[in-house]
Amino acid sequence: MFSLGRNTEKEGGLSARASLLMLAIAMALATPFAIAEATSGDRTDPVRNVPLACELVSTPGMPARANVNVVHTANVCGIVGTDVELQSRTDLGGRVHDYAFVGTMGGGFRIFDVTDPAHPSHAGGYIDSGWENDVQVRGDIVVATFDGVAGEDSSASTCLKTRYPEANGQGVDIYRLDYNELTATFETNLLTCVANPPGGAHNATLHTSGQWLAIEDCCSDWAIDVIDLRNVLQGQAVHRYRLIDASRRDSAGRCPADAAFTCVVMTRPDGSSASSLWQPHDVHFSRDGRTMYVAAIQSTFIVDVRNVLAGQARTISIIPNISEPGGLDNPHNISISHQADISSDGRILVISDERGGGLSETRCLEQPNGLMGGLHFWALARIPGVPETQGASPSNPVKLGSYFNPNPNSAIDPLQEFIDLLPRAERGCTVHVFRLGGNGSVSPGPILTGYDGVSRMPNRELSTAYYGAGVWVLSFAGRPSSTDGIAEDSRTTWGNTLGWNVMPGADTWSAKEYKGAIYAGDMLRGFDVYRYTG
């Protein structure tokens, strides 16, 4: 039997039945907030608290609304899927097992054995519900995030509520995995938690070394909280620094005089003010862990973090959202810098634009030339055959171009009448969470040697989620061409489409390739597995 996890804050822990009861209560309490969010203005990462019923999405052989070179192979329903991370383990008999760690909104994280991608099986998890509940994993350490929908307390974390009653449920829980080599399943135990009010943990990223955690709060604190994990196995996780935007430094509650942490104001490379540019949403690291790439909503930062645990974070460069004429009416400019990952060879930085925050930008599903959030490519080193990149470097990024999916005609969604009954019936279609070939969870290569999790795609290919437009695979090796039989969007100036799949009910949060399969968290469908056949 796999373990649902137990809460070590209370003697004897929580039984599975008690945990499920807490989950049901938390989801019931969270529902009004999700509905309220559906009617609010643009925000990043929309919340949907109710998945489609299992009988609607788990039918074997259900045809896609549209697909080329990407085939649907499996579904786990009944959860609101978000981010996915991968790793592998070896059982007692010497067989390698592959695992998907799936974040959920309102249901805690789940672990699935995907050694046979067509037949995922439960292998563990932890019922500690809350929003957004993105997941990170490095070896035996797992992190889950809580930030509410609009800052409200929607977390069922007993640790946060017991240790930090004034934190309003905002922060992260940190767990230890115990792998049973005989059963090839996991027991999950709570190690500790870290509160970071008032903004909470929208995302969190483990550093490649495992020595620290970056908690990203884009939408309230405008900060990255640096959490010291050097003694985490002893239950110690210490908030050391808050890397904060200048405009938030003196805001109430952000850098209080009695705080245990030290605030560090982020600046431009020359030390001048970068006020209102630093809204960290997601981070990625170089292979050696010395450089951090920060998708900061209003811009994208490249930062030297080799001495971050001593309070030093030096800005190397800032990539502006507006790099071409026309402002935000020009899709080649970025509205929301959402994710910024470096290619496995360190030469190309890929930045995603989550236009409309995933909520309001639906024109790309309603009209052929509607605005959509795309992928933007910047050279950080010379790219053979592209002479304008001769002087490219981390301190001098050079724009290569942008990619927009060709928005193929899809069949009418047979599940639309059921989707219309949910709190937010309209699905956005902007790009969301992606994985580059040759990369693991947080950087090029594995986050920890021996646990794999690295995409097998070539280093100029990627898989990505597109919310209501499903799962896509593309090459970013060069300029677009339609000679392969796929007509590219006329606005694309870099990259080529390799395939896609839009399943009924798709509202896909993340799509990450591993060993030939693409694993996708989906807010309506749950957890999906695809196979790229190109």
Regions found by a protein language model. Name each.
Residues 1-16:
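N-terminal secretory signal peptides that target proteins for export/translocation
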Residues 10-13, 28, 34, 38:
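Intrinsically disordered, low-complexity repeat segments enriched in small/polar residues
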Residues 13-21, 459, 515:
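Hydrophobic alpha-helical segments and their boundary regions
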Residues 19-32:
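Bacterial N-terminal signal peptides
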Residues 35-534:
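Feature marking well-ordered beta-strand scaffolds used for ligand recognition
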